[in-house]
């Protein structure tokens, strides 16, 4: 549902933050 989608999006944002910090 929508809650699961929100969790997935939050996870993607966390990954992007980590990648940006390493880059």
Swiss-Prot record:
InterPro entries per the UniProt record, alphabetical: Antimicrobial_19
GO biological process: defense response to bacterium; defense response to fungus; innate immune response; killing of cells of another organism; xenobiotic metabolic process
Annotated compartments: Secreted
GO cellular component, one term: extracellular region
UniProt KW keywords: Amphibian defense peptide, Antibiotic, Antimicrobial, Fungicide, Immunity, Innate immunity, Secreted
Tissue: Expressed by the skin glands.
One Pfam family in the UniProt entry: Antimicrobial19
Keyword Secreted appears in the UniProt entry: yes
Family stated for the protein in its record: Belongs to the frog skin active peptide (FSAP) family. Pseudin subfamily.
Free-text function comment from the UniProt entry: Possesses antifungal activity against C.albicans and is also active against E.coli and S.aureus.
The protein's name: Pseudin-4
Protein source organism: Pseudis paradoxa (Paradoxical frog)
